[in-house]
Amino acid sequence: MTTDEGAKNSRGNPAATVAEQGEDVTSKKDRGVLKIVKRVGHGEETPMIGDRVYVHYNGKLANGKKFDSSHDRNEPFVFSIGKGQVIKAWDIGVATMKKGEICHLLCKPEYAYGATGSLPKIPSNATLFFEVELLDFKGEDLLEDGGIIRRTKRRGEGYSNPNEGARVQIHLEGRCGGRVFDCRDVAFTVGEGEDHDIPIGIDKALEKMQREEQCILHLGPRYGFGEAGKPKFGIEPNAELIYEVTLKSFEKAKESWEMDTKEKLEQAAIVKEKGTVYFKGGKYVQAVIQYGKIVSWLEMEYGLSEKESKASESFLLAAFLNLAMCYLKLREYTKAVECCDKALGLDSANEKGLYRRGEAQLLMNEFESAKGDFEKVLEVNPQNKAARLQIFMCQKKAKEHNERDRRTYANMFKKFAEQDAKEEANKAMSKKTSEGVTNEKLTASHAVEEEKPEGHV
């Protein structure tokens, strides 16, 4: 008798019910994964490839013997759909569930642990029964900052992805508040989508897509059209967007190692100009991409001639200074400081590098470090009035900061003192009450002693 037959013949075993009445949810329709819904979920959406899912489950062998349960650990089990993190049956079965749904799954060995099993709890060629509750699911956080959430409707082909500078052909459909505002086929260069009214979030997502992949992208304002919005499409400032994107084809750009020094220097001049255009247009993320290319091409370039070395240093210095300015605009002050450090490594007395590092440190409340940088600016250029003003601002901000700290600590100490006084008062009251009770006991004791002789008479 096979394990599957055993499931059918086990009276009172829910696995038997699934074996007889379950829906085949496999694409091959080979009855490898059977499902019965025990509690209907809500909504219409089900998990997609790459989604993070949160489930509770009980796992049993077909004979009813339990081998695992998330309930025993008092925490949900979390995995990503379609990434091979769980048995095939789960990737298939859980993908059919709605949020809040509870179902029973019966899984044949080829969709579970196969001939190998998972000893000691799961023997070879075991059919498994699961009760699964889908608690929640979320799209894939592509950049791990919540700004781009991907939900994959269709897998792509192969393992190659477009890189920055790749030429891509895509179909896109953009929605905002339920309204379709853009729908078209378009070809463009990754990192330059803005030139075609495509938000930077699409560029970023394309670098993680495969050919023929179809996905839904939820873009936060930072990766959409930002504070400016997009009047052309009727998009308000700081709007959240939803795009459905299909990557039809792409041709990768040359990697750094495929380019010689001459080509890198020629391309550096081109992308520097592109970066400046984006910066002047307030497209700081796009500008970062362009300036970043210069760094990736030239920072680790060795064996240059004197002329090439001079040109390379000039491009790198400009790139680091411009990146620092972009990061200041993007309020990424730590990155701004790092870029200034790189620039000052090339030119320790660079006025812009010192000034921008001072700006970043002032905004990070590093007042002494900022003041030191502005003082160095004056050593380089005593006529820099902005640096003098910034030194005054450092002193003013430091004083205000210290005053706030003083008030904060004073209030803290006052509260501690009041709390200590209250505790001392409570102790004194408790002691007084205790002494009163003791005195009453002593008085009562003396009264009893005095009454004793009268009792005997």
From Swiss-Prot:
PROSITE patterns: FKBP_PPIASE (PS50059), TPR (PS50005), TPR_REGION (PS50293). The modification Phosphoserine is found at residue 445. GO terms for biological process: chaperone-mediated protein folding; response to bacterium. Inhibited by both FK506 and rapamycin. Residues 1-26, 421-457 are annotated as: Disordered. It is an enzyme of class 5 (isomerase). The keyword Secreted does not apply. GO terms for molecular function: heat shock protein binding; peptidyl-prolyl cis-trans isomerase activity; protein-macromolecule adaptor activity. InterPro entries: FKBP4/5/8-like (IPR050754), PPIase_dom_sf (IPR046357), PPIase_FKBP_dom (IPR001179), TPR-like_helical_dom_sf (IPR011990), TPR_rpt (IPR019734). Residues 447-457 have a biased composition (Basic and acidic residues). Residues 50-138, 165-251 form the PPIase FKBP-type domain. It catalyses: [protein]-peptidylproline (omega=180) = [protein]-peptidylproline (omega=0). The modification N-acetylmethionine is found at residue 1. The modification N6-acetyllysine is found at residue 28. One of its GO terms (cellular component) is cytosol. Immunophilin protein with PPIase and co-chaperone activities. Component of unligated steroid receptors heterocomplexes through interaction with heat-shock protein 90 (HSP90). Plays a role in the intracellular trafficking of heterooligomeric forms of steroid hormone receptors maintaining the complex into the cytoplasm when unliganded. Acts as a regulator of Akt/AKT1 activity by promoting the interaction between Akt/AKT1 and PHLPP1, thereby enhancing dephosphorylation and subsequent activation of Akt/AKT1. The relative resistance of squirrel monkeys to glucocorticoids is associated with a high level of expression of FKBP5, but is also due to intrinsic differences between the human and the monkey proteins. Human FKBP5 has a much lower effect on glucocorticoid sensitivity. PANTHER family: PEPTIDYLPROLYL ISOMERASE. This is Peptidyl-prolyl cis-trans isomerase FKBP5. It comes from Saimiri boliviensis boliviensis.
